[in-house]
């Protein structure tokens, strides 16, 4: 739920707080995929966009989907969704690298994307590839 402490001077969700929560939600998804929360390092946020304002008192959730796998990196697509209306209020991508926990040396994760024919997910995958010059 969006509280007064989460608002900007326009009385909408502060973008920094929304991005903070996006990174947390995508970290949880990345940790679930890799099975190793200690072996993940944040690398980058890509194209985080607010499509509609998020109002005080609004209940929101984040939906995270793995959309790109490099050798040592994974990219997660995240939607910020209004639980009341189902509207997607913001979208973005977050990339993490997989590392050896105590040395931070890069670690090959071995994760492979599953096959999909979902048009929206295919679009997310193509967009995520574009961040890396593919």
Could you describe each region identified by the protein language model?
Residues 1-18, 119-134:
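Catalytic strand-loop segment that frames the active site of acyl-thioester-processing enzymes
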Residues 2-3, 50, 96-98:
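Hydrophobic residues in beta-strands and at strand termini
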Residues 4, 10, 45-47, 105:
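Generic secondary-structure boundary/loop-capping signal
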Residues 12, 18-19, 53-55, 94:
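Short capping/connector residues at structural and topological boundaries
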Residues 20-28:
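Short, residue-level hotspots on alpha-helical faces of the histone-fold
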Residues 27-63, 67-74, 87-93:
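Hydrophobic beta-strand-centered segment that forms part of the acyl-chain substrate-binding groove
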Residues 55-56, 67-134:
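HotDog/MaoC-like acyl-thioester-processing domains
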């Amino acid at each position: 739920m969006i509280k007064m402490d989460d608002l900007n001077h326009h009385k909408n969700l502060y973008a920094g707080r929304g991005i903070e929560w996006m990174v947390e939600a995508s970290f949880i998804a990345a940790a679930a995929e890799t099975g190793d929360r200690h072996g993940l390092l944040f690398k980058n946020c890509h194209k985080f966009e607010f499509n509609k304002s998020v109002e005080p008192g609004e209940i929101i959730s984040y939906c995270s989907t793995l959309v790109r796998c490099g050798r040592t990196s994974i990219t997660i697509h995240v939607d910020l969704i209004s639980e009341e209306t189902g509207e997607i209020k913001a979208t973005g991508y977050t990339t993490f690298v997989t590392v050896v926990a105590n040395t931070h040396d890069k670690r090959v994760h071995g994760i492979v994307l599953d096959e999909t024919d979902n048009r929206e997910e295919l679009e997310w995958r193509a967009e995520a590839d574009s961040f890396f010059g593919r």
